[in-house]
């Protein structure tokens, strides 16, 4: 049995899609659907059971999972970088993850955890996923800090020898529609361009970057789940790994790709960055991918223009945009 926490969410539901693509349906989806639209991410998927997050947490707390579990893909977390409730993040992103990791270690189940590139803070220490760098990182927001604390705990307790914790960079692609303000700029741009014919980006607050010239490592969600599938097949590959393309691109590049995919000429306007984001905004991110490559991962990452074109034309423009 495979358990996917956050299985109705963005990357989680994409992982359920990948498992289905590989002929696997013995899947338990763990999530908190509440009043969100996440349920739509599951309509096309095949799995044996859905368990509410709180019920699952009780099972984990008592060490009493009613399945013979092969692997847990732990994508369940609060992923809002703007979340300000630190106690909630500590409980949801740290304590819950530690308990689940311990249970997997005890039972021999494969454990793959979602960390984040938000752990790298302002990037002044670079974006290396080696353990020495990890010890010195200073995240800019509480979300990144909660993810950093799990990785530090796993390192300190010797758990990184038996799990994979993945620092996802800027992920985009189908099944992110429920995320509101946390949707990728591609998803937002498609709607804004369709309605107004223009896309607005934040002006740069960094003297080294022009407006729209801030750079991020954008990775297609299908590539993320390919990496996780490979890790499931290679349980001896463990540690903290970056999951990005290793090639930073500008916001202008990204938005231009959306315009091109929509067969429109780019029209970009720049607006002031909200006060609450200033000082907490990463102007540059680029994954160092040597560690994952050296471990033997063969996944070839999709070029930005190709990923954006597929996302726009195959999904965003479709009657059913879901995987």
Swiss-Prot record:
Transport as UniProt keyword: no
Pathway where this protein functions: Nucleotide-sugar biosynthesis; ADP-L-glycero-beta-D-manno-heptose biosynthesis; ADP-L-glycero-beta-D-manno-heptose from D-glycero-beta-D-manno-heptose 7-phosphate: step 4/4
InterPro entries in the record: Epimerase_deHydtase, Heptose_epim, NAD(P)-bd_dom_sf
Catalytic activity line of the entry: ADP-D-glycero-beta-D-manno-heptose = ADP-L-glycero-beta-D-manno-heptose
Required cofactor(s): NADP(+)
Pfam families, sorted: Epimerase
Entry EC no(s): 5.1.3.20
Note on how the cofactor is bound: Binds 1 NADP(+) per subunit.
Active-site residue numbers: 143 (proton acceptor), 179 (proton acceptor)
Keyword field: Carbohydrate metabolism, Isomerase, NADP
Gene Ontology biological-process entries: ADP-L-glycero-beta-D-manno-heptose biosynthetic process; carbohydrate metabolic process
Annotated residues for binding of NADP(+): 10-11, 31-32, 38, 53, 75-79, 92, 147, 171, 179
Isomerase is among the record's keywords: yes
Residue numbers binding substrate: 170, 181, 188, 202-205, 216, 281
UniProt-recorded Gene Ontology molecular function terms: ADP-glyceromanno-heptose 6-epimerase activity; NADP binding
UniProt free text on domains: Contains a large N-terminal NADP-binding domain, and a smaller C-terminal substrate-binding domain.
Subunit: Homopentamer.
The protein's role, per its UniProt record: Catalyzes the interconversion between ADP-D-glycero-beta-D-manno-heptose and ADP-L-glycero-beta-D-manno-heptose via an epimerization at carbon 6 of the heptose.
Cross-referenced PANTHER family: ADP-L-GLYCERO-D-MANNO-HEPTOSE-6-EPIMERASE (PTHR43103:SF3), NUCLEOSIDE-DIPHOSPHATE-SUGAR EPIMERASE (PTHR43103)
Record-stated family: Belongs to the NAD(P)-dependent epimerase/dehydratase family. HldD subfamily.
Protein name per UniProt: ADP-L-glycero-D-manno-heptose-6-epimerase
């Amino acid at each position: 049995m495979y358990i996917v926490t956050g299985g109705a969410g963005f990357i989680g539901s994409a992982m359920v899609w990948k498992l289905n693509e590989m002929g696997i349906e013995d899947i338990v989806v763990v999530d908190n659907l509440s009043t969100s639209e996440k349920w739509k991410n599951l309509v096309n998927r095949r799995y044996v059971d859905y368990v509410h997050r709180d019920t699952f947490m009780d099972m984990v707390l008592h060490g009493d999972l009613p399945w013979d579990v092969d692997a847990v893909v732990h994508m369940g977390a609060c992923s809002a970088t703007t979340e300000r409730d630190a106690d909630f993040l500590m409980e949801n992103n740290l304590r819950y993850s530690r308990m689940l990791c311990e249970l997997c270690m005890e039972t021999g189940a494969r454990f793959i955890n979602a960390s984040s590139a938000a752990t790298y803070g302002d990037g002044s220490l670079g974006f290396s996923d080696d353990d020495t760098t990890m010890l010195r990182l200073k995240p800019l927001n509480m979300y990144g800090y909660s993810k950093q604390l799990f990785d530090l705990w796993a390192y300190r307790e010797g758990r990184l020898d038996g799990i994979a914790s993945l620092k996802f960079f800027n992920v985009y692609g189908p099944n992110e529609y429920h995320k509101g303000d946390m949707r990728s700029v591609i998803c937002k741009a498609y709607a804004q361009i369709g309605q107004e014919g223009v896309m607005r980006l934040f002006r740069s607050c960094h003297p080294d970057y022009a407006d729209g010239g801030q750079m991020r490592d954008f990775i297609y969600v299908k590539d993320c789940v390919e990496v996780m599938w490979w890790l499931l097949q290679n349980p001896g590959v463990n540690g903290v790994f970056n999951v990005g393309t290793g090639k930073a691109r500008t916001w202008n590049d990204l938005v231009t790709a959306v315009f091109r995919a929509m067969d429109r000429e780019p029209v970009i306007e720049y607006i002031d960055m909200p006060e609450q984001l200033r000082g907490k905004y990463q102007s540059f991110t680029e994954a160092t991918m040597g560690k994952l490559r050296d471990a033997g991962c063969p996944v070839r990452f999709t070029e930005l223009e190709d990923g954006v074109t597929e996302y726009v034309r195959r999904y965003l423009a479709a009657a059913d945009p879901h995987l």
